Amino acid sequence: MDTIKAEEISQIISKQIRDYEKKLDVSETGTVLSVGDGIARIYGVENAMAMELLEFPGGIMGMVLNLEADNVGVAVLGDVTHIKEGDIVKRTGKIAQIPVGEALLGRVIDATGEPIDGKGPLGATEFSRIEMIAPGVIKRQPVNEPMYTGLKAIDAMTPIGRGQRELIIGDRQIGKTAIGIDAIIRQKDTGVKCIYVAIGQKKSTVSQIVENLRKHDAMSYTCVVAGCASDPATLQYIAAYAGCSIGEYFRDRGQDALIIYDDLSKQAVAYRQISLLLRRPPGREAYPGDIFYNHSRLLERSARVSADLGGGSLTALPIIETQAGDVSAYIPTNVISITDGQVYLEPSLFFSGIRPAINVGLSVSRVGGAAQVKAMKQVAGTLKLDLAQYRELASFAQFGSDLDKATQAQLDRGVRLVEILKQPQFQPMSLAEEVIVLFAGTRGFLDKYEVEKIKEYEPQVLAYMKSKHQDIMQEIDDKKVISPELEQKIKEALTAFDSVFVAG
């Protein structure tokens, strides 16, 4: 049996003493003065920063929103029932941030960046603050590249460019989200990364949207950020900023990204709730005074950055829900004034079967015209005017039956144009498909058919063009302009199709 030598013991002890490193964990702490309704008042964290994360017992995090003389107002980002008066709160020294990068594509996360799709950790290595300063004037370049939505009515009459902010506004349940989802599906194989931000929605609704995106192979280039109705108001409020930071990651690397905020009305309500609980003075409709700044600083982060910075873009499609079509309410007017145009959806059109239910007269794209390709301008240049004149004539025509031939022809053409602008959900179209259908409508190829036939005409003419005239479709997609020779080819192809369609 080995004997233990005294020298060895002394050597071991002296080595341990030598290697001993005293670790002191110094952190600034505070005490919970009061807590309730998702808001905690903390005394003692004198050096806390705005938007800084504080740690409550049990690992619950809170975000500093109010900095007052003797305490700070903190919005709790978790279950407030586990926090009680007198609890010790630690400063983290970190401003609220979120994981970003390619690893988030195909995933569903909450507003703090935690995965909620049951697929394990994200594996993201980079982080970004949720609040970033928007690019300055010099760092931007004009919007001049198209961002196709795949919807004929939008791409023809209110075109959207990369880096634009186009508002989708309308009452509840009339297809606002459907436009956003179709726009995401249309980005397949274009290299555009998509972010869908669900704010204040039911979890079942978010689940359904994710399933629809998966069904159409759109999740591979999409990240869903969910601040659901059951989440604390703070998470619903910061979800939009978190989603924007993910989009900025791609924008700042020279890529193109598209973000859908669904919807900013619920975000405003969540922010109003937080502000009132923090005892901030209420303004119009009880919203706080900085609600405009809340939306403007979010939407200004969507931009097309200059070529020196990579030339990337972040396009935003914010959604606003109106009450009984009132676009002159506080939040709708705010967001209309911030964005570069709006697509206005009307219940009366929706219920009469015109879907997407876009009101052409009230919808506008302030900067997208410069991004619209020449081929689309050639076929849809007068479409908006034609439809506006048709609506005006239609309202007069109901008072009298004796109309001259020209007026009757204009009315007939208008009915057919309205018909070809209808489009089913989850069926976004390519540029060539849109151009062919609109060419047929605006050049009078549909005038000879009954209105009921138009619905059958569109899928059949597209199938015919793809099988017999793929070269024409390819040329439209590649050159994005209709030359006189190509126009002649399209006319001949559509004339040839007429005999097939009539016979069929």
Curated annotation (Swiss-Prot):
One Gene Ontology term, aspect cellular component: plasma membrane
Protein localization: Cell inner membrane
Primary location group: membrane
Keyword check for Nucleotidyltransferase: no
Site, as annotated: Required for activity: 363
E.C. code: 7.1.2.2
Topology relative to the membrane: Peripheral membrane protein
Keywords: ATP synthesis, ATP-binding, Cell inner membrane, Cell membrane, CF(1), Hydrogen ion transport, Ion transport, Membrane, Nucleotide-binding, Translocase, Transport
Keyword Nucleotide-binding part of the UniProt annotation: yes
A GO term, aspect molecular function: ADP binding
Catalytic activity reported: ATP + H2O + 4 H(+)(in) = ADP + phosphate + 5 H(+)(out)
CDD domains: ATP-synt_F1_alpha_C, ATP-synt_F1_alpha_N, F1-ATPase_alpha_CD
Family annotation (PROSITE patterns): ATPASE_ALPHA_BETA (PS00152)
Protein residues bound to ATP: 170-177
Transmembrane feature ranges: none
Family stated for the protein in its record: Belongs to the ATPase alpha/beta chains family.
Subunit annotation: F-type ATPases have 2 components, CF(1) - the catalytic core - and CF(0) - the membrane proton channel. CF(1) has five subunits: alpha(3), beta(3), gamma(1), delta(1), epsilon(1). CF(0) has three main subunits: a(1), b(2) and c(9-12). The alpha and beta chains form an alternating ring which encloses part of the gamma chain. CF(1) is attached to CF(0) by a central stalk formed by the gamma and epsilon chains, while a peripheral stalk is formed by the delta and b chains.
Functional summary from the UniProt entry: Produces ATP from ADP in the presence of a proton gradient across the membrane. The alpha chain is a regulatory subunit.
Protein name: ATP synthase subunit alpha 1
Native source organism of the sequence: Syntrophus aciditrophicus (strain SB)
